[in-house]
Amino acid sequence: MGDQIVVLGSGIIGLYTTYCLIYEAGCAPAKITIVAEFLPGDQSTLYTSPWAGGNFSCISPADDTTLAYDKFTYLNLFKIHKKLGGPECGLDNKPSTEYWDFYPGDEKVNSLKQYLKDFKVIPKSELPEGVEYGISYTTWNFNCPVFLQNMANFLNKRNVTIIRKHLTHISQAYLTVNTKVVFNCTGIGAADLGGVKDEKVYPTRGQVVVVRAPHIQENKMRWGKDYATYIIPRPYSNGELVLGGFLQKDNWTGNTFGFETDDIVSRTTSLLPKILDEPLHIIRVAAGLRPSRHGGPRIEAEVCEEGKLTIHNYGASGYGYQAGYGMSYEAVKLLVDNQKVKAKL
């Protein structure tokens, strides 16, 4: 059968990684197996990706590495958009406005203005009270549950095997003697997985309110020192609008709370009053645990017994959709560098 590759995890990072293996490194899909406890369509607090608001925003840190992951993802998502069949796949472009109660720094601003389509700095005279800086641009929006399912279906149809399996130790991901490489894309699970148990991994809890508001087709975000308010329309979702949110470090609670729902609705309708031009129809309230990591994402190759290779790719926190393609590209490059795979990188 030849050497086999296992991708451990089927959240957005695992799916991006599998896509990169095929389309950036030229690996044969039939030699790739995705192994995961949770698969697209599942709902669990420990399966973060379906709960995401789902857009490219300025939530990520301003270090050079993460900014590069963001840039790569933003500029290359059109490839996935095209291969998956256009906007119906759960990925589309929409206008976005972002405000900060503080200046986000030259490093972030100078990076963003290089590549964001339709990038404009909003004049101070047009900023809401208390806002220090604002920009507008055209972004990518995800319908996260739909996009995950379509990505998995796309890969499966190209002969990638997808297996539901709960593992307690990363060594179990080496399914056969032919499994030579494992990509560890376990997200929050990296905190407990035997052989990994990364003490730097922690949850950043969020709560969102999903409403029916087809008249809202723009993103609007406001970033404070200790809060985040965001309004994110889901493409091809029959008018779903995600309202958020919270960034609660080290909070493992998967429950939702009415007082947080009230706070989210208050903040988002103040930020974009026209949400209330139509009666507010709440579809669902959900909480998710962003897979954060002290020091940022771990993208690292680890040579194991008998020359087997584990490549870690996790810790994307709340920016997996917008930085994950770049992260996965970098992780796959580690395979190319270590195994000298014939590749297009």
From Swiss-Prot:
UniProt-listed Pfam families: DAO
EC category name: oxidoreductase
InterPro entries in the record: DAO (IPR023209), FAD-dep_OxRdtase (IPR006076)
Flavoprotein as UniProt keyword: yes
UniProt-listed Enzyme Commission number(s): 1.4.3.3
Dependence of activity on temperature: Optimum temperature is 50 degrees Celsius.
UniProt keyword list: FAD, Flavoprotein, Oxidoreductase, Peroxisome
Renumbered ranges of motif Microbody targeting signal: 343-345
Positions that bind anthranilate: Y230, R290
Catalytic activity: a D-alpha-amino acid + O2 + H2O = a 2-oxocarboxylate + H2O2 + NH4(+); D-methionine + O2 + H2O = 4-methylsulfanyl-2-oxobutanoate + H2O2 + NH4(+)
Cofactor dependency: FAD
Gene Ontology molecular function terms on file: D-amino-acid oxidase activity; FAD binding
Binding site for FAD: S10, I13, S49, G53, N55, R290, S317, G320, Y321, Q322
Signal peptide (UniProt feature, chain positions): none
Effect of loss of the gene: No growth when D-alanine is used as a carbon source, and decreases growth when D-alanine is used as a nitrogen source.
GO CC annotations, alphabetized: peroxisomal matrix
Binding residues for (R)-lactate: Y230, R290
Family under the similarity heading: Belongs to the DAMOX/DASOX family.
Biological role stated in the UniProt entry: Catalyzes the oxidative deamination of D-amino acids with broad substrate specificity. Enables the organism to utilize D-amino acids as a source of nutrients. Enables the organism to utilize D-alanine as a nitrogen source, although it is not strictly required for this process. Also enables utilization of D-alanine as a carbon source.
Protein name, as recorded: D-amino-acid oxidase
Species annotation: Candida boidinii
Gene expressing this chain: DAO1
